[in-house]
């Protein structure tokens, strides 16, 4: 029995990791929003102006008045 586990456990772990990596790649390539978000983020570096705009939008959304 130990001889079986000597090769089965490493093979099982490698196959499990490959399946998880493949599943993640499928989600990345077949989910349209993920690729566009990643491309936009890599196009240009984040500047202070963008950070301030993001914080302002976040504050306005979080602490906005009640909608009537």
From Swiss-Prot:
Membrane topology per record: Single-pass membrane protein
GO BP: neuron maturation
Cellular localisation: Nucleus; Cytoplasm; Membrane
Tree of life domain: Eukaryota
GO cellular component, as recorded: cytoplasm; membrane; nucleus
Keyword presence, rRNA-binding: no
Keywords: Cytoplasm, Membrane, Neurogenesis, Nucleus, Transmembrane, Transmembrane helix
Tissue: Highly expressed in brain.
Segments passing through the bilayer: 7-27
The UniProt record lists the keyword Transmembrane helix: yes
Function of the protein: Plays a role in the regulation of neuron maturation.
Protein name, entry field: Small integral membrane protein 45
Organism this protein belongs to: Homo sapiens
């Amino acid at each position: 029995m130990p001889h079986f586990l000597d090769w089965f456990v490493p093979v099982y772990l490698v196959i499990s990791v490959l399946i998880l990596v493949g599943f993640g790649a499928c989600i990345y390539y077949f989910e349209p929003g993920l690729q566009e978000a990643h491309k936009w983020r890599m196009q240009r570096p984040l500047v202070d102006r963008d950070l301030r705009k993001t914080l302002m939008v976040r504050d306005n959304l979080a602490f906005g008045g009640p909608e009537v």
